[in-house]
Amino acid sequence: MILVQLAAEEAQNPLIPEVPELVIGLLAFAIVFFVLGKKLLPNINKVLEERRAAIEGGIEEAEAMKVEAQSVLEQYKAQLAEARHEAARLRQEAQEQGATLITEMRAEGQRQREEIIAAGHAQLEADRKAAAQALRQDVGTLATDLAGKLVGESLEDHARQSRVIDRFLDGLEEKAEATR
């Protein structure tokens, strides 16, 4: 009999379950599906929604930070350009001041040179006059001594000596100036 039962059981298709098993399986599936749908699925959806909101919030925050960073970069570039313009302006002013200072110093040097040259000419003229006066006296004394030796008399009258010597030297100077 066991053999007959085994043979009868073998004839049944193993892919088609028996009705009571099928009903129990469907009932168990419906219970599990209901529990998962009512309890677990809302929690999963809630976590997924929070995650999506966090990601979107992070993206929005990143966009806001990007816009802010771009704004700061533009401000930095504007400040840098302004600083460059200011540096160029200061450099130009310094060059202009330097050129003005050089011009003033050259003018001052020229003025001092002219003063030194004028003082030198005045000193030379004073020295020439002093030398001419000393030379007149020495020439006059020598001429008087020589004339006295030639004539054999003493020519000690100073007033007359001075007049004769001055007339003679003035005549020499006039001849020298006429030949120039």
Curated annotation (Swiss-Prot):
It is a single-pass membrane protein. The keyword Transport applies. It comes from the Bacteria. CDD domains: ATP-synt_Fo_b (cd06503). GO terms for molecular function: proton-transporting ATP synthase activity, rotational mechanism; proton-transporting ATPase activity, rotational mechanism. The keyword Secreted does not apply. It is found in: Cell membrane. Belongs to the ATPase B chain family. F-type ATPases have 2 components, F(1) - the catalytic core - and F(0) - the membrane proton channel. F(1) has five subunits: alpha(3), beta(3), gamma(1), delta(1), epsilon(1). F(0) has three main subunits: a(1), b(2) and c(10-14). The alpha and beta chains form an alternating ring which encloses part of the gamma chain. F(1) is attached to F(0) by a central stalk formed by the gamma and epsilon chains, while a peripheral stalk is formed by the delta and b chains. This is ATP synthase subunit b. The lineage of its organism: Bacteria, Bacillati, Actinomycetota, Actinomycetes, Kitasatosporales.
